């Protein structure tokens, strides 16, 4: 993937956030390398569709150890166009829905905390009725250690996307995201952090047998702002936490993916990244070097 340097954001017009007292993100993000990531509208493309192989030819490549990003990173925007328009894998297209979002991701650490900074331009609103009127924007990322979750290494957070989860066609509204054979005790889970714009709140949870949006102890801080048409959200997360928190350590790589719920979206109507590796003082697709 292409990497660039990102100028630091200035002049917040709208600011939201929760504020941690101990950790401090880099004062000058312009010195931290940024990774360009295209998030795309995924339509109805659950893990079952990806791995079955009858409609998705990439299932064979996955069995050989290839990653989703290895095949699709350069065509993510095209995939989003096809699905947002209803040409493929979307039985109920939303007129005006943005097909993709280009984001930049920066990462750093101070030996005790991980800092993740996401920036992207606000797409034009679709004009559709809001699904979550209280939160125009939400952003979440997932971490996984050990590649115990199905598809975590190859597809990032796609291992939590199932065809019977809520907002999928015909699914019950009570069924949340989950992972196959999910178990905190056995390390089969995603660590989940989310920030919501309208509520001015951050959530620290996990996805195992179900999605739980509380109970984590690693998330210290999440701050977001809208400067003109550009969003900036910074997460501060301790290396170690508690149950449901992936423990981070220098020299290691972790499976990583993130999603943006734009335009007051909920459930599957988000924009998602493919799967990437996050390195803590180790070379990954995204590298969090000590500052």
Swiss-Prot record:
SMART domains: EB_dh
GO molecular function: electron transfer activity; heme binding; metal ion binding
UniProt superkingdom: Bacteria
Post-translational modification note: Binds 2 heme c groups per subunit.
Signal peptide start and end residues: 1-23
Binding site for heme c 1: 68, 71-72
Misc: The second heme binding site has an unusual CXXXCH motif.
Full protein name: Cytochrome c-552
């Amino acid at each position: 993937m292409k990497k660039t340097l990102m100028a630091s954001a200035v002049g917040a017009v709208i600011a939201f956030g929760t504020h941690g007292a101990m950790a401090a993100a880099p004062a000058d993000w312009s010195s931290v390398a940024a990774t360009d990531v295209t998030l795309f509208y995924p339509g109805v493309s659950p893990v079952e569709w990806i791995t079955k192989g009858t409609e998705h030819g990439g299932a064979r490549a996955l069995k050989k150890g290839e990653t989703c990003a290895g095949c699709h990173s350069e065509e993510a925007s095209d995939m989003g166009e096809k699905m947002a328009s209803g040409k493929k894998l979307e039985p109920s297209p939303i007129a005006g829905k943005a097909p993709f979002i280009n984001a930049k991701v920066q990462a750093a650490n101070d030996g005790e905390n991980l800092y993740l900074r996401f920036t992207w331009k606000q797409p034009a609103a679709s004009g559709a009725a809001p699904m979550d009127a209280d939160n125009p924007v939400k952003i979440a990322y997932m971490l996984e250690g050990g590649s115990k979750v199905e598809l975590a290494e190859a597809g990032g957070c796609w291992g939590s996307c199932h065809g019977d989860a809520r907002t999928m066609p015909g699914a019950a509204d009570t069924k949340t995201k989950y992972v196959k054979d999910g178990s905190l005790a056995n390390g089969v889970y995603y660590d989940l952090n989310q920030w919501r714009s309208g509520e001015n709140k951050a959530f620290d949870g996990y996805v195992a047998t179900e999605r739980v949006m509380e109970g984590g102890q690693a998330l210290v801080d999440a701050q977001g702002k809208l400067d003109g048409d550009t969003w900036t959200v910074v997460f501060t997360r301790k290396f170690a936490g508690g149950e449901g928190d992936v423990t981070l350590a220098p020299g290691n790589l972790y499976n990583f993916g993130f999603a943006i719920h734009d335009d007051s979206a909920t459930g599957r109507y988000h924009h998602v990244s493919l799967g990437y590796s996050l390195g803590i003082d180790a070379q990954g697709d995204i590298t969090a070097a000590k500052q």
